[in-house]
């Protein structure tokens, strides 16, 4: 079995990688083969005495349950339960794929707009940038995906079209920083309340990513799936001593 070691952002990222190799619709892939490859990958990490985080092991146990259900005799109730578990897994992978495509789209937009800068294009996020504590960027994109979907629905209901010159990231960076004046923090969703169209929403988000990249802003999320807040990055000399 050809399993190459590489870094993944989480178990769904690994599963998406394995599913993508089949070059077919996610719901048509041979799920048993994918499960075997995933378990082989985790087993390889353990055999090499590399740390396997809890989320990978939780997913492994879920996959083993799905696999065991598929091996049981074809009893109606068992088959239905197994099919439900399998469909739920595939739905999770499909949703993750959408979030990843969104991230790639946003990065492409950033690179396109970076051509208007006097400086050379840089990566959206680099290793030293402080995002959500112990989180991956998927948390940020997941939140933004929900915001964008809600704003699209809002714009559609209002049936309004506002014409304006092309939004610029550098202008939006100023707006983001001004939104934090007089505040300790700003809920990410609140940043987009006054946005007039989808293009403005996306440019605001790109501006936020740029400020995070330059470490002018940091993101804070107090609990899993909780709200994400923007905060100004304070100089060490400004941080009160405990």
Swiss-Prot record:
Quaternary structure and interacting proteins, as annotated: Component of a cohesin-like complex composed of ScpA, ScpB and the Smc homodimer, in which ScpA and ScpB bind to the head domain of Smc. The presence of the three proteins is required for the association of the complex with DNA.
HAMAP family: ScpA
An example Gene Ontology CC term for this record: cytoplasm
Keywords in alphabetical order: Cell cycle, Cell division, Chromosome partition, Cytoplasm
Single GO BP term: chromosome segregation
Highest taxon, organism lineage: Bacteria
Cytoplasm recorded as keyword: yes
Name by which UniProt lists this protein: Segregation and condensation protein A
Family the UniProt entry places it in: Belongs to the ScpA family.
Localisation: Cytoplasm
Function: Participates in chromosomal partition during cell division. May act via the formation of a condensin-like complex containing Smc and ScpB that pull DNA away from mid-cell into both cell halves.
InterPro entries with a match to the protein in the record: ScpA, ScpA-like_C
Statement: the UniProt record of this protein carries the keyword Zinc: no
């Amino acid at each position: 079995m050809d399993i190459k070691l590489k870094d993944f952002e989480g178990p769904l990222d690994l599963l998406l990688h394995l599913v993508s190799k089949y070059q077919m619709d996610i719901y048509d892939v041979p799920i048993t083969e994918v499960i075997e490859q995933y378990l082989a990958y985790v087993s390889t990490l353990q055999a090499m005495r590399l740390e396997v985080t809890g989320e990978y092991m939780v997913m492994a146990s879920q996959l083993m349950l799905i696999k065991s259900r598929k091996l049981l005799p074809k009893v109606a109730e068992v088959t239905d339960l197994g099919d439900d578990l399998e469909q739920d897994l595939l739905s999770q992978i499909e949703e993750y794929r959408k979030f990843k495509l969104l991230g790639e789209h946003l990065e492409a937009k950033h690179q396109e707009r970076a051509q208007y800068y006097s400086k050379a294009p840089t990566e959206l996020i680099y290793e030293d940038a402080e995002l959500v504590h112990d989180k991956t960027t998927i948390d940020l994109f997941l939140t933004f995906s929900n915001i964008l979907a809600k704003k699209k629905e809002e714009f559609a209901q209002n049936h309004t079209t506002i014409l304006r010159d092309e939004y610029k990231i550098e202008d939006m960076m100023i707006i983001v920083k001004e939104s934090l004046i007089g505040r300790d923090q700003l809920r990410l969703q609140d940043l987009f309340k006054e946005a007039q169209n989808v293009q403005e929403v996306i440019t605001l988000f790109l501006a936020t990513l740029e400020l995070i990249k330059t470490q002018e802003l940091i993101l804070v999320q107090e609990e899993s799936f909780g709200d994400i807040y923007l905060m100004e990055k304070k100089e060490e000399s400004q941080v009160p001593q405990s």
